[in-house]
Amino acid sequence: MALEFNTIGVSLKWASETTAGSRPLSGYATIPSIKGTPAIDINPNKIEVTDLSDAYRRYVDGVKDVGDSFDFTANLTAALKTAWNSCVSAATAARNASKATWFEINIPNFDSFFFAGLPTELGVNEMGVDAVIESTLHIVPNQIAGWATKST
Protein backbone atom coordinates (compact mmCIF):
# COMPACT_ATOMS: atom_id res chain seq x y z
CA MET A 1 0.00 0.00 0.00
CA ALA A 2 1.38 3.39 -0.98
CA LEU A 3 1.67 6.17 1.54
CA GLU A 4 0.74 9.42 -0.16
CA PHE A 5 2.14 12.77 0.87
CA ASN A 6 0.23 15.96 1.58
CA THR A 7 1.34 19.57 1.27
CA ILE A 8 1.54 20.31 5.01
CA GLY A 9 5.00 21.65 5.75
CA VAL A 10 6.21 22.00 2.16
CA SER A 11 8.68 24.86 2.03
CA LEU A 12 10.74 26.92 -0.41
CA LYS A 13 14.37 27.51 0.54
CA TRP A 14 17.35 29.17 -1.11
CA ALA A 15 21.15 29.33 -0.83
CA SER A 16 23.85 30.89 -2.98
CA GLU A 17 26.91 28.90 -4.00
CA THR A 18 30.03 29.36 -1.89
CA THR A 19 32.06 27.55 -4.57
CA ALA A 20 31.09 28.34 -8.16
CA GLY A 21 29.53 25.33 -9.86
CA SER A 22 28.76 23.41 -6.65
CA ARG A 23 25.19 23.26 -5.38
CA PRO A 24 25.14 24.00 -1.63
CA LEU A 25 24.27 21.03 0.56
CA SER A 26 23.46 23.16 3.62
CA GLY A 27 22.76 26.70 4.72
CA TYR A 28 19.44 27.16 2.91
CA ALA A 29 17.16 29.94 4.20
CA THR A 30 13.39 29.49 4.17
CA ILE A 31 11.07 31.86 2.32
CA PRO A 32 7.99 32.22 4.58
CA SER A 33 4.28 32.32 3.73
CA ILE A 34 4.40 30.16 0.56
CA LYS A 35 0.92 29.05 -0.52
CA GLY A 36 1.58 27.39 -3.86
CA THR A 37 4.36 26.06 -6.05
CA PRO A 38 4.52 25.87 -9.83
CA ALA A 39 4.46 22.65 -11.82
CA ILE A 40 7.99 21.96 -13.03
CA ASP A 41 7.58 19.74 -16.08
CA ILE A 42 10.83 18.39 -17.51
CA ASN A 43 9.34 17.07 -20.72
CA PRO A 44 11.62 17.67 -23.73
CA ASN A 45 10.36 19.32 -26.88
CA LYS A 46 9.76 16.91 -29.74
CA ILE A 47 11.54 17.30 -33.06
CA GLU A 48 9.87 15.71 -36.05
CA VAL A 49 12.23 13.56 -38.14
CA THR A 50 9.68 11.99 -40.51
CA ASP A 51 10.87 11.35 -44.04
CA LEU A 52 9.07 10.22 -47.17
CA SER A 53 9.66 6.53 -46.44
CA ASP A 54 7.75 6.69 -43.14
CA ALA A 55 4.09 5.66 -42.80
CA TYR A 56 3.86 7.42 -39.42
CA ARG A 57 5.39 10.60 -38.09
CA ARG A 58 8.57 10.03 -36.07
CA TYR A 59 10.06 12.23 -33.36
CA VAL A 60 13.23 12.54 -31.31
CA ASP A 61 13.70 14.39 -28.06
CA GLY A 62 14.82 17.98 -28.33
CA VAL A 63 15.72 20.62 -25.77
CA LYS A 64 14.09 20.36 -22.35
CA ASP A 65 12.03 23.48 -21.69
CA VAL A 66 10.84 24.08 -18.15
CA GLY A 67 9.51 27.54 -18.97
CA ASP A 68 10.86 31.02 -18.50
CA SER A 69 9.65 31.62 -14.92
CA PHE A 70 8.76 29.54 -11.88
CA ASP A 71 5.99 31.42 -10.08
CA PHE A 72 5.35 30.77 -6.39
CA THR A 73 2.27 32.18 -4.63
CA ALA A 74 2.67 33.59 -1.12
CA ASN A 75 0.75 35.62 1.43
CA LEU A 76 2.22 39.12 1.43
CA THR A 77 3.73 39.71 4.88
CA ALA A 78 6.54 41.87 6.23
CA ALA A 79 8.54 38.67 6.86
CA LEU A 80 8.04 37.56 3.25
CA LYS A 81 9.14 40.94 1.90
CA THR A 82 12.27 40.93 4.07
CA ALA A 83 13.19 37.33 3.22
CA TRP A 84 12.56 37.78 -0.51
CA ASN A 85 14.55 41.03 -0.66
CA SER A 86 17.45 39.25 1.07
CA CYS A 87 17.23 36.43 -1.47
CA VAL A 88 17.22 38.85 -4.43
CA SER A 89 20.17 40.83 -3.01
CA ALA A 90 22.20 37.68 -2.32
CA ALA A 91 21.39 36.24 -5.76
CA THR A 92 22.54 39.48 -7.42
CA ALA A 93 25.82 39.39 -5.47
CA ALA A 94 26.29 35.71 -6.29
CA ARG A 95 25.67 36.32 -9.98
CA ASN A 96 28.21 39.18 -9.96
CA ALA A 97 30.71 36.68 -8.50
CA SER A 98 29.84 34.08 -11.21
CA LYS A 99 27.98 31.91 -8.69
CA ALA A 100 24.45 30.54 -8.84
CA THR A 101 21.59 30.75 -6.36
CA TRP A 102 19.86 27.45 -5.69
CA PHE A 103 16.29 26.82 -4.61
CA GLU A 104 14.92 23.81 -2.78
CA ILE A 105 11.30 22.70 -2.73
CA ASN A 106 11.36 20.73 0.51
CA ILE A 107 8.75 18.02 1.03
CA PRO A 108 8.61 16.69 4.61
CA ASN A 109 9.50 12.99 5.00
CA PHE A 110 10.67 12.83 1.38
CA ASP A 111 13.39 14.15 -0.91
CA SER A 112 13.65 17.74 -2.13
CA PHE A 113 13.61 19.18 -5.65
CA PHE A 114 16.50 21.53 -6.50
CA PHE A 115 16.97 24.13 -9.22
CA ALA A 116 19.12 27.21 -9.74
CA GLY A 117 17.63 30.48 -10.86
CA LEU A 118 17.44 34.23 -10.66
CA PRO A 119 14.75 35.69 -8.39
CA THR A 120 13.10 38.90 -9.53
CA GLU A 121 12.07 41.87 -7.41
CA LEU A 122 8.79 41.65 -5.53
CA GLY A 123 5.85 43.28 -7.30
CA VAL A 124 2.23 43.91 -6.29
CA ASN A 125 -0.56 41.49 -7.16
CA GLU A 126 -4.12 42.52 -7.89
CA MET A 127 -6.31 43.01 -4.83
CA GLY A 128 -10.02 42.81 -4.20
CA VAL A 129 -12.58 43.28 -1.45
CA ASP A 130 -12.56 40.79 1.45
CA ALA A 131 -9.40 38.96 0.38
CA VAL A 132 -5.92 38.21 1.63
CA ILE A 133 -3.14 40.13 -0.13
CA GLU A 134 -0.94 37.71 -2.02
CA SER A 135 2.28 38.09 -3.93
CA THR A 136 3.83 36.11 -6.75
CA LEU A 137 7.50 35.28 -6.43
CA HIS A 138 9.14 34.88 -9.84
CA ILE A 139 12.31 32.85 -10.34
CA VAL A 140 13.92 32.59 -13.79
CA PRO A 141 15.32 29.03 -13.92
CA ASN A 142 18.73 28.36 -15.41
CA GLN A 143 19.65 24.90 -14.12
CA ILE A 144 17.66 21.90 -12.92
CA ALA A 145 19.27 19.43 -10.53
CA GLY A 146 15.99 17.62 -9.83
CA TRP A 147 15.30 15.28 -6.93
CA ALA A 148 18.00 14.82 -4.30
CA THR A 149 18.45 14.36 -0.57
CA LYS A 150 17.22 17.45 1.27
CA SER A 151 19.65 20.06 2.54
CA THR A 152 20.84 20.13 6.13
Show where each model-derived region lies.
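Solvent-exposed edge beta-strands and adjacent loop segments
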Residues: 2-76, 116-133
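Polar, enzyme-active/binding microenvironments
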Residues: 16-21, 109-110, 149-151
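Acidic glycine-/aspartate-rich tracts in secreted/extracellular proteins
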Residues: 76-80, 144
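A generic structural signal for short coil/turn motifs at secondary-structure boundaries
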Residues: 81-82, 128
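Short, acidic/charged, Gly/Pro-enriched secondary-structure junctions
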Residues: 82-116, 120
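Short, charged, solvent-exposed linker or helix-capping segments at domain edges/interfaces
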Residues: 83-86, 148-152
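Short beta-strand and beta-hairpin "edge-sheet" elements
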Residues: 104-149
